[in-house]
């Protein structure tokens, strides 16, 4: 039997709120939970995910592991020819 007066109040119908709109209900120790992102507006789950290429890291990865597009492979060939001529 649990001890009395030591457990938090349980709210079985706690509201999850995102941007002022109730998006779901769940059980929690707070009556309302404020969130910025949830599965309904997260880019991964909505299919609108974009890759942010910071400082060309994606291109660098693609070149390193041989997954580069034909445009970047042509540039690589030109740069290697220039190095050989020098």
From Swiss-Prot:
Cross-referenced PROSITE patterns:
RIBOSOMAL_L31
InterPro entries, per database record:
Ribosomal_bL28/bL31-like_sf, Ribosomal_bL31, Ribosomal_bL31_A, Ribosomal_bL31_sf
Instruction: Give the region (Disordered) as residue ranges.
Output: 65-86
Alphabetical UniProt keywords = Ribonucleoprotein, Ribosomal protein, RNA-binding, rRNA-binding
Residue spans with biased composition (Basic and acidic residues)?
73-86
**Gene3D superfamilies per UniProt:** Ribosomal protein L31 (4.10.830.30)
Q: State the source organism's domain of life.
A: Bacteria
Q: Which GO terms describe its molecular function?
A: rRNA binding; structural constituent of ribosome
- Pfam families hit by this protein: Ribosomal_L31
Q: Which GO terms describe its biological process?
A: translation
User: Which GO CC annotations does the UniProt entry carry?
Assistant: ribonucleoprotein complex; ribosome
Which family is it part of? Belongs to the bacterial ribosomal protein bL31 family. Type A subfamily.
What the entry lists under HAMAP family is as follows:
Ribosomal_bL31_1
Q: Give the function comment from the record.
A: Binds the 23S rRNA.
Q: Which NCBIfam families match?
A: L31, PRK00528.1
Task: Describe its assembly.
Answer: Part of the 50S ribosomal subunit.
Report the protein name in the record.
Large ribosomal subunit protein bL31
Q: Which organism is it from?
A: Prochlorococcus marinus (strain NATL2A)
Q: Which gene encodes it?
A: rpmE
């Amino acid at each position: 039997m649990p001890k009395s007066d030591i457990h938090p109040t349980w709210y079985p119908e706690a509201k999850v709120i995102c941007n002022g709109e109730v998006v779901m209900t769940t059980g929690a120790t707070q009556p309302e939970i404020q969130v910025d992102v949830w599965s309904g507006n997260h880019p991964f789950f909505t299919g609108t995910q974009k890759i942010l290429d910071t400082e060309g890291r994606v291109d660098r990865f693609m070149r390193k592991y041989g997954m580069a597009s034909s445009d970047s492979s042509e540039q690589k060939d030109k740069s290697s020819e220039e190095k050989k001529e020098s």
